[in-house]
């Protein structure tokens, strides 16, 4: 349900499934920790949606009591953090890429509150932990699919911002494509927005006009352009193949559950401390995966991709991490 006050938020109450005994319900509720999340975008946005999904899953099993605020302006973010801390939330989750210094200042003022924030920088003791969607591994695999599928040998890539968290995914995708197709060329553009589907769509059309027949959809809007032009696309973070049938060849999926569950366990056990939770987005921890449409991807390509996936999972192949801004090929 939605609460109204200084902050507009929704409260997700844990759904306690059991025998229906009052005693059992009371015990489960007492064990649930109080968690708040702060989002600068709507929970429907792809990156935010994965965090929201993981927290909802934890709430549904009775592990947490979950409230959240969405569409919080950067200028208001610090105030919202402080309000949740004052309310006694035990764990506060969010993303502070645009306000790193302010967020760390709040954490310092509330040393008994656990903070887990999407961040470009490192953790700060005793209570400020960081995470990111390290899905470079499935991004590499999706690149293999794209490199095998292109006929024009031109792939278009539309990103949000050229920050390390985005750059590394694009580079991994490019490396995967080049591994199976050394002749492939890339057209790269950043729209300087996390959510502007019309702008992303316009950028995608320009790339198609320049010869791209496969589109890497790091942002919403690109797949819509692909559908209109009848070209194929690669998804990112979430699986949108149901929304774009016969268009999405493969997608690199981010699963935030491993990260959230680790943080909840640490808070519940009194062992939460400043740490980098990034590794829990790796495939080995279940934080990343590849989905592909076997109706659209040839069997030999599927096998090659799955074989490489097994190598990654077994520690026999390591995807390179490159945080530098990717550029178009000449």
Name each model feature, range by range.
Residues 55, 141-184, 188, 276-298:
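An alpha-beta-alpha
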Residues 268-330:
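Hinge/cleft segment of the Venus flytrap/periplasmic-binding protein
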Residues 62-71, 181-194:
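Short beta-strand elements in bilobed, periplasmic/extracellular small-molecule ligand-binding domains
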């Amino acid at each position: 349900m939605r609460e109204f006050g200084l902050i507009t938020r929704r409260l997700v109450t844990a759904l306690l499934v059991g025998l229906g005994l009052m005693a059992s319900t009371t015990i489960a509720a007492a064990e649930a920790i109080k968690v708040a999340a702060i989002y600068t975008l709507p929970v429907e946005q792809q990156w935010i949606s994965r965090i929201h999904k993981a927290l909802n899953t934890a709430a549904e099993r009775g592990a947490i009591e979950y409230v959240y605020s969405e569409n919080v302006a950067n200028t208001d973010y610090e105030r919202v953090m402080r309000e949740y801390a004052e309310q006694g939330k035990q764990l506060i989750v969010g993303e502070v890429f645009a306000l790193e210094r302010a967020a760390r200042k709040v954490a310092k003022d509330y040393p008994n509150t656990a903070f887990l924030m999407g961040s470009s920088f490192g953790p700060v003791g005793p209570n400020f932990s960081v995470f990111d969607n390290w899905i470079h591994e499935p991004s590499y695999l999706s690149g293999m699919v794209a490199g095998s599928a292109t006929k024009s040998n031109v792939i278009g890539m539309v990103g949000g911002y050229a920050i390390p968290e985005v750059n590394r995914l694009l580079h991994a995708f490019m490396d995967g494509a080049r591994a199976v197709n050394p002749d492939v060329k890339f057209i790269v553009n950043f729209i300087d927005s996390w959510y502007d589907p019309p702008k992303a769509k316009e950028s995608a059309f320009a790339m198609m006009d320049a010869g791209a027949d496969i589109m890497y959809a790091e942002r919403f809007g690109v797949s819509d352009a692909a559908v209109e032009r009848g070209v194929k696309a690669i998804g990112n973070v979430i699986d949108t193949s149901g929304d774009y049938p016969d268009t999405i060849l493969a997608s690199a999926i981010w699963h935030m559950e491993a990260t959230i569950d680790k943080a909840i366990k640490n808070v519940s056990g009194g062992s939460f401390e400043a740490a980098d939770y990034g590794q829990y987005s790796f495939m080995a921890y279940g934080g990343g995966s590849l989905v592909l449409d076997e109706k659209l991807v040839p069997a030999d390509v599927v096998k090659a991709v799955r074989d490489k996936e097994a190598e990654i999972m077994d520690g026999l192949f390591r995807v390179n991490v490159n945080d530098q801004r990717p550029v178009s090929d000449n």
